Amino acid sequence: MKKNKWLFIVALSTIMVSACQQDDQQSSPDDSNPSNEQQEQTEDQSAPDDSNQAENEDEPAEEEEEPFDEETMSLPTEYFNEIEEVDGQAIIQNPDNILTFVNHDFLLPSDYEPEDLVIPDVKFSYGHQDIPKSYMREEAAGALEALFAAANEEDIELAAVSGYRSYDRQQELYDQAVSKSGPDQEFVANPGSSEHQSGLAMDVSSASVNYSLVQEYEDTEEGQWLSENAHHFGFIIRYQKDKEDITGYGYEPWHLRYVGEAAIEIYENQLALEEFFDLVKEI
């Protein structure tokens, strides 16, 4: 894939908060995590038919249509947010979209819960538990399994820490943070603005940092491997270093967001998802 070089002039005035505020250790039993997750504590032969094979050889193989065109930087309309303003907020109306664009400006509906949530077959920092944060959407979960398998082959130890989180759970965390630190607290995302609710995000850590979610993870062998390889499996580091003014969130080397094939273009050009959607054309 050829690389493009772009110059961006970005003027966004958003507050910087940590996007991955997960349940602190005194949360309810069905969503607790015993690991030390500092950023979020501020708080699962028959023989071939030769005749059919001959017929199939005469027919061109059907290729699955890929939504993202890297040559034209274009996407079909259905991969863009459909927005409806509700009480002064921009609410996403097509949240099942794999490229759903969630941030401070575009919120998920309060009643949205993905219908295809599954537990990926990967290592978790708290062991295998059937609790909400173990889940991801099915496509993202399969990609996470492939990523973890590739890491394991290179003796890179990864552990999933926190995936899906409901709107109501995010509201609880937000209320707790405001009660503790006041309305100007900068640690817990507002309900609706967390990518975890989409089922497309997973926080990942390793034993080298005691399975905590800390910026020092970028300096570990595991964190570096993740940064350099996640895009091969459809994931991006959603909240990048030196992109805080664009994303509105602090640097989170642990936060993976599944975007499918667009991940390669985003990675190779070091784009934030905000920048990607500024550039990509709607068709």
Language-model regions, residue ranges each:
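Extracytoplasmic cell-surface/polysaccharide-interacting catalytic and binding patches
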Residues: 21-161, 168-283
